[in-house]
């Protein structure tokens, strides 16, 4: 496996074939303390960069048609877990207990990663959109910091980002809302999550990802017959 193959295959989207064996270097499980609180959206946006510098993980949910944000920060701790563990809120537990989120209500979701330095302005535009054109939306908007990586086609390639996620109930119409949000995300150089809703063409994807051509070159070299391309990826490559 060549080095450029490895770099591309870390985000392979199922298009590089089946992985039959992998050797992983792991770390020991560790304990995390989660702290949650409510604040106004303006206060939260104003303090968000400081919160990110002070905590390992930082995110919040804003509830449309209100000024309320539910903030969540997570840090490593030496404190002992306390059971029964609350589903969310202020709690201490093992990493595999605290990091996952329980989401029992079915919904659709669009998530874009926006450069960290532009994310607050983007969020304000999303807020204005909801206040003006989509007042019926009750699902919260999620705002979460994420560090840069070096993975080809990653939404966080080469830069720190904030992921902004919008949601709608599974039985509700989502396309007008999501398309309006996507227009805003793209105006802030956003990149879509590969596993969630987007409406982009292959040409648009290529303009967003500087490693697009090299990723496809590696993919096509590994699978020239295109056996592992699904309908969605074929639509992007045509």
List PLM regions with ranges.
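C-terminal substrate-binding/cap subdomain adjacent to the FAD-binding core in PCMH-type
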Residues: 1-140, 145
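Generic recognition of stable, solvent-exposed alpha-helical segments in well-folded globular domains
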Residues: 43, 117-121, 125, 173-176, ...
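N-terminal flexible segment immediately upstream of the FAD-binding catalytic core
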Residues: 91-108, 141-162, 227-238
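Generic non-transmembrane alpha-helical segments
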Residues: 122-134, 180-188, 214
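C-terminal hydrophobic structural anchor segments
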Residues: 140-198
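Activity-critical C-terminal alpha-helical subdomain
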Residues: 191-238
């Amino acid at each position: 496996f060549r080095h450029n193959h490895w770099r591309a295959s870390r985000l392979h989207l199922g298009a590089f074939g089946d992985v039959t064996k992998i050797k992983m270097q792991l770390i020991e499980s560790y304990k995390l303390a989660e702290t949650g609180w409510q604040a106004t959206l303006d206060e939260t946006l104003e303090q968000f960069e400081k919160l990110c510098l002070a905590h390992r993980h930082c995110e919040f949910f804003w509830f449309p048609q209100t000024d309320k944000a539910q903030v969540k920060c997570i840090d490593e701790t030496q404190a002992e877990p306390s059971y029964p563990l609350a589903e969310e809120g202020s709690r201490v537990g093992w990493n595999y207990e605290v990091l996952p989120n329980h989401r029992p209500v079915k919904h659709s979701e669009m998530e874009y990663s926006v450069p960290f330095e532009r994310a607050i302005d983007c969020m304000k535009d999303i807020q204005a959109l909801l206040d003006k054109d989509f007042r019926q939306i009750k699902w919260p908007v999620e705002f979460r910091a994420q560090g840069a990586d070096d993975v080809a086609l990653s939404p966080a390639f080469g830069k720190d980002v904030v992921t902004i996620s919008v949601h709608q109930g599974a039985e509700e119409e989502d396309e007008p809302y999501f398309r309006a949000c996507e227009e805003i995300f793209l105006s802030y150089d956003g990149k879509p999550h590969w596993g969630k809703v987007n409406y982009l063409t292959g040409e648009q994807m290529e303009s967003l990802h500087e490693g697009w051509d090299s990723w496809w070159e590696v993919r096509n070299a590994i699978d020239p017959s295109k056996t592992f391309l699904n309908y969605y990826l074929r639509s992007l490559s045509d």
